Amino acid sequence: MNTIITGTQSKAADRYAIDVMKIPSLELMETASRKAAEELASRFGPETDILICCGTGNNGADGVCMGRILLDKGYRKIRLALCGDPAKETEEFRFQMETWKARPEHTQPMRFVSAESDPAPAEPNPAPAEPDSAPDNAAGGEIRIPFLPDTGVLVDAVFGIGLHRPVEGVYRDFLAEMVRIRKTFTLAVDVPSGINSDTGEVMGIAVQADVTVTFGRSKTGLVRAEGPAFAGEILVKEIGIPEEAYEAAVRQYPD
């Protein structure tokens, strides 16, 4: 059994489990998000301010799902900060956002924009969005923000295993804001954003985690090069991907 695999192999194992073994992607996502949420809940109580930073892919979808699970556990100070082109959101991400918005306790999602491109930049550390508050400066039920608000706990769900090129543009600014506000505790979902999940290299900028909750198998990017310095404590959580899927992935992409 391969206990450490590359991010590329992990992604291939996910696809094999979904496409060949017919395991629903949302089932895997629900399990992964629940494991990450349970880890956070074991460390911090329902009164904790938690900011979940999400990209538009399935790592971001994990983050949104995690937020909804925490709401269901009685956490009421959960905020979502989104980054990326809405047109590039995955089907799973959109499903998780609809599920989030269906919860009466949800807070208004915040959409990060670079300060240079925002026509009316705000001051750093805007006030937290209140549950069910009306959006005041964006269509689609979102609040546009050029800065991230301070928080007690930061959840990094931006890139996960999918990053293999330098971080640029609004994503670089987003990660820089995450680095700026990081204070008490940061949990990375699967892989700290900015770390190449295969090589462990920093792709221009990366977010320092205190704990990385990674799914199925540990990733080579967490133990190679600069990966260990950014991953913090590495916790591997089983999410129901069969060994057959990992074996197929390693055959397809030998490291």
Regions found by a protein language model. Give the residues of each.
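Generic serine detector
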Residues: 10, 25, 33, 42, ...
